[in-house]
Amino acid sequence: MAPHVIFIHGMYLNGQSWQPWVERFAAAGFSCSAPSWPFHNGDPHKLRLEVNPDLGDLTFAAVTDHFKTLIDDLPERPILVGHSIGGLLVQRLVNDGFARAGVSISSAPPQGVVSFSPHFLRANFPHINPLAGNKPVYMTPERFHYAFCNTLTRPASDEVFERFVVPESRNVPRSTFGGSARIDFAAV
């Protein structure tokens, strides 16, 4: 029997964004799931209209613990696939022994790996802005096109935005600067 595969989304998305991958892997004989982070489950449009008041307090460690709990309920360790900060979650979970294997796609950097590229800083500062407190951050279609879907046409990017984008906690990326996002590269 093929191992279970868990797909882990990145910021501003939820598990629905992995649906085409889940369908493709299921057709190949894998059991799959794409659970959402805390406060991310549901219809993206509704989540943009009705933001959970606790979203702003969500941290990288809390999301990691959420997935550890889900994985502990499985009969065996899964294969993990994650994108962006979901890829960093995969590395952390593999590091901590919660996966048989992991694939990180365009991973966010772990603690201690920092880029000072002007593009990186421009794309990421709004998400970690220390002056914004713990208020959730809302992606605009313009910003989404610049920071996430810049290889798509603007109309195609806007379609992706409408289908998948949700509000986010600034504390998830902020907290990756601390020990919760430290990776022992010898272990992964």
Placement of each model-derived feature along the sequence:
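Flexible "cap/lid" loop of the alpha/beta hydrolase fold
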Residues: F98-N134, N171-A181
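Conserved alpha/beta-hydrolase
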Residues: F25-E50
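Conserved acidic catalytic loop of the alpha/beta-hydrolase fold
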Residues: A61-P78
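Alpha/beta-hydrolase
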Residues: N134-V188
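Short beta-strand element of the alpha/beta-hydrolase
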Residues: P3-G10
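Gly/Ala-rich beta-loop-alpha elbow adjacent to hydrolase catalytic centers
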Residues: V81-G86, V90
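Active-site glycine-rich loops that stabilize anionic/oxyanionic intermediates
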Residues: G10-N14, S84
